[in-house]
Amino acid sequence: MSGRVRPIVVLVGPPGSGKTTIGRRLANALNTSVVDSDVLIEQLQGKPCGVVFAELGEPNFRDLEAEVIDFALTTAGVVSLGGGAVTTESVRQKLRAQIVVWVDVSAAEGVRRTAVENSRPLLDTTNPLERYSELLAQRRDFYKEVADYRAHTDGRSPQQIVADILGFLETLR
């Protein structure tokens, strides 16, 4: 067995699915740390992730994100990835060696949760529900490809979701 450090679990899913909240609570339950790729990008660039995305454009942002994820995947604990990270092939390849949970949400609920923020350039449109639905359609197969477990979040408390993920992780021991 390799002595290499790796995450306990990696969370993927669309914006507003609850990855950040679930990641913090899951890390707390596992008595470990949480690393969020969006937060790492913000720290590296010194500005909000949405601003970095808008300034760099999606292709350059995804390249930066992939580099940050390379680092994040060398840390122990829980790792939470940005919603579009799975669109990058090199990221999906690296996730094959990880335990990945897809934190899933419906388009309507995802839009409701992200409506209070103005930090999501891909959702800055006159019809956020339509755009969110398009993003889900574009990314769904990528989430399925990398996920070992799917946690539905609509109508469920963070505590319930964390309990489900902990139950899944227990089956791997």
Swiss-Prot record:
Its EC number is 2.7.1.71. This is Shikimate kinase. Pathway: Metabolic intermediate biosynthesis; chorismate biosynthesis; chorismate from D-erythrose 4-phosphate and phosphoenolpyruvate: step 5/7. GO terms for cellular component: cytosol. It comes from Corynebacterium diphtheriae (strain ATCC 700971 / NCTC 13129 / Biotype gravis). Its main location: cytoplasm. It is an enzyme of class 2 (transferase). It is found in: Cytoplasm. GO terms for molecular function: ATP binding; magnesium ion binding; shikimate kinase activity. Substrate binds at residues 38, 62, 83, 139. The lineage of its organism: Bacteria, Bacillati, Actinomycetota, Actinomycetes, Mycobacteriales. The gene is aroK.
